[in-house]
């Protein structure tokens, strides 16, 4: 089934310009890795929707398996009210296909853990199992103890903690960014991916979550709103053609709010250029972000 992590996002913190993941239970930061993002997205679901207190969640518990010379560790264990293991979770990176081997691995771990439920997830698909004796029974629906109980409140702070919105964004920009983040990233049935980019300034904040729009066959547009290490907020849009990123633009929402003329940089095989996004694409902070995607596509095609 579609992962419950799809509409959840990990918290981030900037340390000396580096964007790091923040584990809210351990109150520590970690390197921004795909598997760790999946783990923290699931934690966000468990604590915010499923109603499981952070005090009943553990990480990296050592499991000593027969014939296993390495020290295997669990990704997540959730406990019941009596602090008995309730759920064992194995996390994979989003590009890892979950197969029988992964299920067998987590089942081996569970021989030592003894949880009645097991979950294997890559953040896109969840595979739930119920353990009855020696049987591992696949579940068609999410087990009852983990059915969402709480409504998520996605306030401005929610998006700031997850590095979608920077703390220096002007008030008019905050209203746009909060509404746009909800539109882009709150629906679990819409494709969202974390994209990484090398070789560009940290100011651009390119490495973040993008809502993916299919324009036509083999043509996609990725749209992101992301905070940078300096408290700024960027609107980043990427054109992907035939599986390759061919152009992107990045704009400061504060420059848009201040009605600065040269507010946007476009990068493509043709090089770098500066434009006024308002004039070129009819964009302003009163627009619905989804309504201007066709104009973003036209603009990037023109410059690629």
Please name every model-derived segment.
Residues 1-117, 127-304:
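A short, conserved, highly charged catalytic patch centered on acidic carboxylates
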